[in-house]
Amino acid sequence: MAERINLVFHNKVLDGTAMKRLISRLIDHFGMAYTSHILDQVKTLGFQQATATSISLGIDDLLTIPSKGWLVQDAEQQSFVFEKYQHSGNVHAVEKLRQSIEIWYATSEYLRQEMHLNFRMTDPLNPVHIMSFSGARGNASQVHQLVGMRGLMSDPQGQMIDLPIQSNLREGLSLTEYIISCYGARKGVVDTAVRTSDAGYLTRRLVEVVQHIVVRRADCGTARGISVSPHNGMMPERIFIQTLIGRVLADDIYIGPRCIATRNQNIGVGLVNKLLNFRAQPISIRTPFTCRSTSWICRLCYGRSPTHGDLVELGEAVGIIAGQSIGEPGTQLTLRTFHTGGVFTGGTAEHVRAPSNGKIRFTEDLVHPTRTRHGYPAFFCSIYLYVTIQSQDILHHVKIPPKSFILVQNDQYVESEQVIAETRAGASTLNYKEKIRKHIYSDSGGEMHWSTNVYHAPEFTYGNVHLLSKTSHLWILLGEPCHSSLVSTSIHRDQDQMSAQSLSVKRRYTSKLSETNDEAKQKIASEDLIADYSDVNPSRCTDHYNLVYPAILPILDENSYFFSNCLSKRRRNQFIIPLQSIQEHKNQLMPCSSISMKIPPNANGIFCANSILAYFDDPRYRRNNSGSTKYGTLEMYSTIKKEDFIQYRGVNEFRLKSKVERFFFIPEEVHILPGSSSIMVRNQSLIGVDTQITLNLRSRVGGLVWVERKKNRIELKIFFGDIYFPGGADNLSRHSGVLIPPGTEIKTNYKESKKVKNWIYVQRITLSKKKFFFLVRPLVTYEIMDGIPLATLFPPDLLQQRENAQLRVVNYILHGNGKPIRGNYDASIQLVRTCLVFKRNQDKKSSYSEAARASVVEIRTNYLIRHFLRIDFVKAPISYIGKRYDPLGLGLLAEDWTHKNPYSKARIHQNLNQNKGTIHTFFNRNKGSQSLIILSSSNCSRMDPANGAKSNNVIQESKKEEYPMLQISNSLGPLGTYPPIANCDSFNRLLTHNQILVTNYFHLDNVKPPFQVFKFKYYFIAENLKICNYNPCSNLRLNAFYLNLNFLHPNSCAETSKIMSLGQFICQNVCIDKTRPPFKSGQVIFIQVDSVVIRLAKPYLATPGATVHGLYGETFFGGDTVVTFNYEKSRSGDITQGLPKVEQVLEVRSVDSISMNLEGRVEGWGKCITGILGIPWGFLIGAELTIVQSRISLVNKIQKVYRFQGVHIHNRHIEIIVRQITSKVLVSEDGMSNVFLPGELIGLLRAERMGRALEEPIHYRSVFLGITKASLNTQSFISEASFQETARVLSKAALGGRIDWLKGLKENVVLGGVIPAGTGFRGLVDPSKQYNKNNIPLKNNLFEGGMTDLLVHHRKLFDSFLNTLIYHHHRIDRFYNDS
């Protein structure tokens, strides 16, 4: 060894980082040869010490952590609490998954820290501790799996497994944990085998793209540069230093008047430190992006060589170095995944804690309420928020970073070290996210219910895709679904009670056709008679406005009803519109089907602003043949306002109401034929009337035949009109495609001309390139009449202005301008529709919601029925409403229905078990058949008063043995009532034996003495929600449209209590009253004076953006998909998740979803640029900025993957690759037919130079090719053919006569020539034309130098604009979102 000298002994541990610094300093001071000699001595010393120590590893050296037991127990307790939250509907499945993952990840990390402390305190010389924490062998993650806990695992797809492995490898795994562990181990093996080949193929493609990039000049003379700044808050200082070192300045740098660095100066460590200390201006540097060359690069734009620390030499193949620099780390990093065994290495959020006790205050205007990703309520701040904590005498200030969650309320008292805010995790974790779709499946069968927050997706008009507008619950009402094969033979109907176990039913009695299921709902019981209600006196009222007529709702088509011209009650917050009966329609002149009412079918009965409430189809605007409409030259509204839109068919399909007073219909005959039909007429031929077209089809008119063949059908059109050939019809050519008014004189040939008597339409028919003629087609003119007598159509009382709403009449054309209209033979086409539009007068101070809820209300006393349409403007109550897909179940009645008792005696026989249930029927539209669901007593919970309790209002759950059979109803009638469900057939029909009779849909004035039903008095519920005993002397006015019922004890009617609604949904553990135990989750289906029946239900919380499957009221079986969540998840912390992303970016595949507002953002960007610089400069600089920003974005995306793994690649290598895949443009117009063809790929610089040379703009758009496509679009066909698709490339090159100039390395290797790099480069360049190694070339000609300076001066003026904008928008990412 070398002779020792007296040096200072540094007693410090040399880890990997310290060793790197030592080697770097040794190279700087002593050089490469002497440094290698010193390192050999260090290696020899290490081997000697390791041999002397003789560390061995045994199973006794694996020391377990004593605190592991209570840590795991605490994590299990937190998971159990969160599971209860999910069952009660407080959090959804994704929030529970996130919370579970973070709980177990935090537990695992804490155990890892405890493991290190345990080793240091108990056995610091433990061999496991020495090896792992010194970095000699193994790492902390592996030792943690040996002595801590194996933790969360990833499956082979990289998805997280929710169930953690609580055991470690020292203790041994259970069978379940072993299977989960095999997932992670298999993931490591698969990644090691498969990903290595992927990384190798990625390296090959990268080298193919840039193999011809060689340094061929010293300076390209560019004046452009990329501006970077260390103090804009966007770039960390470490990355800023790595970006600058080795670059060349593109412009001088000044601090005040003093120049500290000049253009073309190499940036070293000293200059970077000087720039950081002086806080200089933004620095403009030269990069491969700014080089003006096309197929090579200059020394100054490339910068310093990484091998010897000086400017790169001429002839160096920097392209191949760049390709290997990116691809080779991926090959090496795939081997790391085997050692961690697929263990999840994610990240958790960071917390901000209170420094002391005190009251916290912050500005509430800067935050808004939200939910955390775990479902907790919090406040979200988008900018920096300053929080003050006032203790006794000290005022603490805490700065909360942007995009954080505030977990406490304003003016709340907090304790020291309490978590007050949650900040977003670091960029290394957050930026690596992927979008996941998680499906939630139903645990049991039942019936789907949802709230008004679920809306139909407008892009799927006829599908069953539903989305959520805000956070709400989905409910599966428990029941036992039966398959549709059993329904067809079943005699049971909706609300019948039957056995839940036996479906073999025989029925001896069949009701007459004049009796429908809703009027004759039978309670099936063994040998029991249905009670006869004929002796119950119906209530007759003397006042005209309260006469109750028998009426039903005839179904015209889906969701259409008759509209009445009778009464309309006016209230402050609602409309009440009576619906007309059949008998009332018989005495009117207008036909029954003329006016129809529309309840939105896909919006759960919600009328938004400008919704169509009713419509009238005028027979004058009806056609029986096909054609198209033309609005003529009359213009529509130029300014589109929000109130000019009409919501059509309940979905977000908005149509602009056009102010046209006249429109035209162009008739034509259209036949839609199957693709296999044999047509007996020729295309583009003339036929007469009644010509045989097919075997069983004849033409109704004569004219020109036009046949269009589409995918699976043939569209045959017959145009009738006059035909003029273009011999002298030059005048007609000017009128082609326009409407010609009467009185216009047109020339039909050279000599003749005629005046047009009626409106005509001139259409040009092209037979081939040189053959065409004109077809003059007749028009049918329609005038839109505003003078329709509204009193005969709609009730005049409805059209009056109200405080909160207004109904207005609007005429609009059903079909767009020029749109083809297809009609069937037996169906007519309606052109104009007169609509009654619902307009909401929204008050700014009003607390009502913008939308109104519509529901069909039925008022009945015994067999007297009346239907109303009710529109509420109040906010939606707690109860959920929605659409039932069993609309009305009512059939047409006989004329003598009013004289028949609806409840006649019947004897029904059925073998019943003790377990009774009630049937609910639904119409399954997808299958086209009915399905039923049986609600048995096991699915209900009954709450009764506690006997002997001190309080009268205490309710407890009854025991099952006391009530073996839950008797739901004691008399004829349905099982409870429902909330205001649109189009519901069973709406508030509750006939019971209780003291409270539900009559809250009834008006009474001057009623006769109290009528008795089974010797019980009627009790009414007034508007103040009190139960009132009837007084025959008083004029009682009831709240006819209020759903809420009081839940009172019979001995305490005067007391007030919580209001419960029929149909209301109650979550589990929600306390309605402090004196009562909490209810189970379910729906209130029956309310008595002394008890309430709740149908058990399972709530599913869903957040905005979730997709709801199925339809409202649809029957779900166990395991069916209920809802799908879209959420973001951090990627696993290994390169296997990053390498595919690098490949996606380099191949220009779509990584993230495109922003919904992308078009608007691009338009705003263009307006901003043109506003700053003016229109001519704006378009040019905007186009260049787009290319520059997209290149910077791609570089940043690729760098993030490798920096996350701790791999440092210089930006210049990635920039060379990105420069090649973004250097082509696509010619978009035939503006230069003599140079380029449309669709041709050319170089960007070539297009710019050609445009300047020819003084003619070239229309092109920039494209990202991807590395594979860029390898197949080079200047060398030999290089392309040796890559892939050899036959196609060579044949295409031979047909095109391509010439290969052998400028790249690969083509010279293939042909055995000297590669144009290294020493072979000097033979290609004339020595007299080579640049000197000086940075500034000499000026041989004064005039030439002056011209050059002049051009450079103008170029600098342009580039100064460009550099300024690039600096301001350096981090704008417009093409790809960071994942």
UniProtKB/Swiss-Prot annotation:
The keyword Transport does not apply. Its EC number is 2.7.7.6. GO terms for cellular component: DNA-directed RNA polymerase complex; mitochondrion; plastid. It holds the Pfam family RNA_pol_Rpb1_4. GO terms for molecular function: DNA binding; DNA-directed RNA polymerase activity; metal ion binding. Its cofactor is Zn(2+). CDD domains: RNAP_beta'_C. In plastids the minimal PEP RNA polymerase catalytic core is composed of four subunits: alpha, beta, beta', and beta''. When a (nuclear-encoded) sigma factor is associated with the core the holoenzyme is formed, which can initiate transcription. Belongs to the RNA polymerase beta' chain family. RpoC2 subfamily. DNA-dependent RNA polymerase catalyzes the transcription of DNA into RNA using the four ribonucleoside triphosphates as substrates. This is DNA-directed RNA polymerase subunit beta''. The lineage of its organism: Eukaryota, Viridiplantae, Streptophyta, Embryophyta, Tracheophyta. The gene is rpoC2.
